[in-house]
Amino acid sequence: MPYDATKMMDWQISEEAEKDMPSPWQWQEKLGLLKEEILPMGRLCKLDFLKIMNRLKDKPDGKYIEVTAITPTPLGEGKSTTSVGLMEGLGKRGVNVGGCLRQPSGGPTMNIKGTAAGGGNALLIPMTEFSMGLTGDINDIMNAHNLAMVALTARMQHERNYTDEQLDRLTKMRRLHIDPTRVEMGWIMDFCAQALRNIIIGIGGRQDGYMMQSKFGIAVSSELMAILSIVKDLPDLRKRLNEITVAFDRRGNPVTTGDLEVGGAMTAFMRNTINPTLMCTAEYQPCMVHAGPFANIAVGQSSIIADRIGLKMFDYHVTESGFAADIGFEKFWNVKCRYSGLKPHVSVLTTTIRALKMHGGGPKVVAGLAMPEEYTKENLKLLEKGIVNMVHHINTIRKSGMNPVVCINAFHTDTKDEIALVRKHAEAAGARCALSEHWAKGGEGALEFADAVIDACKQESQFKFLYPLEMKLRDRVSTVAREVYGADGVSWTPDAEAKAKMLENDPKYDDYATMMVKTHLSLTHDPSVKGVPKGWVLPIRDVLIYSGAKFLCPCAGTISLMPGTSSNPAFRRIDVDVNTGKVKGLF
């Protein structure tokens, strides 16, 4: 029986479901794993991916299903909930199913968006551990990342304070001539802290560091998090952590973590992060959690490692991409799958009637405020105008050769005529379409959805990339802008174009993937523009270089790597029951 999600908070549903949650050793038996492949951590466990992959290397892969969404409202449209609901629906159909979601950042958890654990009866458990650090991967990434900044700033201080002779005699340290105006990396923390976007460090005497402008980003924007999502194994992690560009010297040459001799220590912090954490849904379907990069400012994917394990362990493996199809799906398609070599079968387009009404010209949706009545009452005119956004994303998925399935993530305010209108346009655009009530009913409410996905998986995928790596950077950006965003073209600031030309002329960057940095709230660079706008140009103001991840990141519009905390954050409603020690108020 599903829980009454209209009367119970998510954390209350999680508490009830946790009473019968399998232990790590029960999971070992249920999943047919060997004892040495389970790494217990309290009531959770990690999976030793090398041991599992070595044992299952000859087993055929299962069906590979990606979950994305239409351009969302600021509230999000329920991709995590839909991913969990699909696992539960497939489980109700008796198939061997599992999946992988990203680890949530503490910033959104304590801010507006919540935990990304799903919701209602389509929920990952245990919710407290999921929301409050899980098995420590983000903390390990923060330590490794900030250690690189410690190495850099200490080196700058010592090079200023000591002569060449003293440096050689004391430490055998060669002078790197670091340019304090060209420090790329910055510091990170796992909260939305707008006060730390621009800071001055090193204030004090000569022993108090090197005084310069610096910055903080949110932990999930770190290149190290992106690296975790794409690495193949521990040697690959070690190699990439030694190649990160931290700064540039006064001649314009990169200063790397290898130059600072810190890559090995960074790997020591992250050695355990390469193993995914095993959790489950409220209906006890297995789901891994691994990596957590945002999609608008990073790659937005759970890990290749977890997908490789899942495709060996399960007949159907579900993975989620961040934000909408123009952001997360595009990176799944052209970045993640290029690195992994895996061939996906189906892409689920999570769709809500409220978001389509917004794209049709509905009133502004503001987190924390009541929804205007246009969203809670039938309005076929707004809906029909906004459906173009869904159709645009269906067409994007079809360009990849994958089979699209539109999931109408049901709300109790949706009417039969509204649902029928969405279904008609989705099917006319070449997608299968299913209504799903997984939030209210769990797997039982997702049977139509599960059946549509099973049917789509029977159709052979014609997967292909949008562009070849041989294509020049500016041409790749133009291709993504035109084919995925619907832009007429691309404009470059003089500095950004000069940087792009430099990168195009250096063969070292020929095999770097292109990872766009853009708002998730619009197909354009302007978050206020909704629907499917025409006659616009994508402005590129910079190109970031992630030399460890091997990403070139063109930045469209103004994007901050450190979000801000709102005036009504979630942490105001989170507390601990001091009699039981249990956390309450998470959502």
Swiss-Prot record:
The enzyme's E.C. designation: 6.3.4.3
One Gene Ontology molecular-function label: formate-tetrahydrofolate ligase activity
Annotated ATP binding sites: T73, P74, L75, G76, E77, G78, K79, S80
Pathway(s) it belongs to: One-carbon metabolism; tetrahydrofolate interconversion
Pfam families found in the cross-reference section: FTHFS
InterPro entries: Formate_THF_ligase, P-loop_NTPase
Keyword Calcium: no
Known catalytic reactions: (6S)-5,6,7,8-tetrahydrofolate + formate + ATP = (6R)-10-formyltetrahydrofolate + ADP + phosphate
Domain of life from the UniProt record: Bacteria
Biological processes annotated in GO: tetrahydrofolate interconversion
Swiss-Prot/TrEMBL keywords: ATP-binding, Ligase, Nucleotide-binding, One-carbon metabolism
Keyword Transport carried by entry: no
Family in the record: Belongs to the formate--tetrahydrofolate ligase family.
HAMAP family in the record: FTHFS
Protein name: Formate--tetrahydrofolate ligase
Organism this protein belongs to: Syntrophobacter fumaroxidans (strain DSM 10017 / MPOB)
Source lineage: Bacteria, Pseudomonadati, Thermodesulfobacteriota, Syntrophobacteria, Syntrophobacterales
Gene that produces this protein: fhs
